[in-house]
Amino acid sequence: MTDASNVCSNPDCRVAQLGTCHLDHDPVDSCPHYGSREAADLDPGEIEELSAPVERTMDGIELRSNKVIPESGITNFRNRVRAKTIVLAGEQKTGKTTLLAALYGMFCKGPVGEFEFVSSQTLYSFAERKHLALFDPERSVPVTPRTSRGDDVNFFHIKMKAGDNLSEIVISDRSGEAFEDARLDTALVAKLSELALADRVCFLLDAARLTKKETRPGYSRIFKQAIRSLLDNDAVPKSAVLEVLVTKFDRVSDGQDGLNPLQDLEQYEQELRDEFGASGYEFEIHRICVDFH
């Protein structure tokens, strides 16, 4: 039976036991005291407070959301965790988000090279991106939702081990439009705040676009401009390693009509080494392709 104190603010009321009002109000809900205690104890709240919190507590223990680390939280995270910062730099549709999803998918299967997966504080967001990449079984190639221009930079975290040695990395995820805007207007380079934290900056080179006759001249020039805009504005620490990750390498077709795409790619890679290898940075080039199967 309901406790009277829960339904009536009058301490002498026994409506919960007797069903009648102590002050002879009939019906009982016409009594000004009836229900006032319960109503006063209710928290009306606000709409914003009803949204899912980033962190939850259970039995006094704070639980992580396991979602991406926002820009506002990366400094505090790096103060707590000794992690190398990898910046993925590339314009639209070069495969940055797909690369993140593929990396998680490879670790789900087992070791990646000499590295074994240990843990991640952004596991939910990794799994979400991989799920979205595979959601439509009719697609012949994986497609991941693009990071929006309006989104701030976020970071993914991986803890791994090689033998007995543990290491941790955080990987940035920012929209390709932001890098394109910075190339066109170098005043915007300063807004790419993740670059100042970088131990490695990985520029994603779209091999399919580079080796097509229609897009090669413009794209080869734009890609170099994108790197140069960051270096000339001192946005990248001198201690950082510069890497070019040649993506979509699996989409480079065999030569036809006298064209040799692989030879064109090798020639362009050498141009990059000649131009940026002498820029005072350690400079590397790696060819990659995504396999979700």
Predicted regions and their residues:
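Glycine-rich phosphate-binding P-loop
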Residues: 84-109
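Switch II (G3) loop of P-loop NTPases
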Residues: 164-189
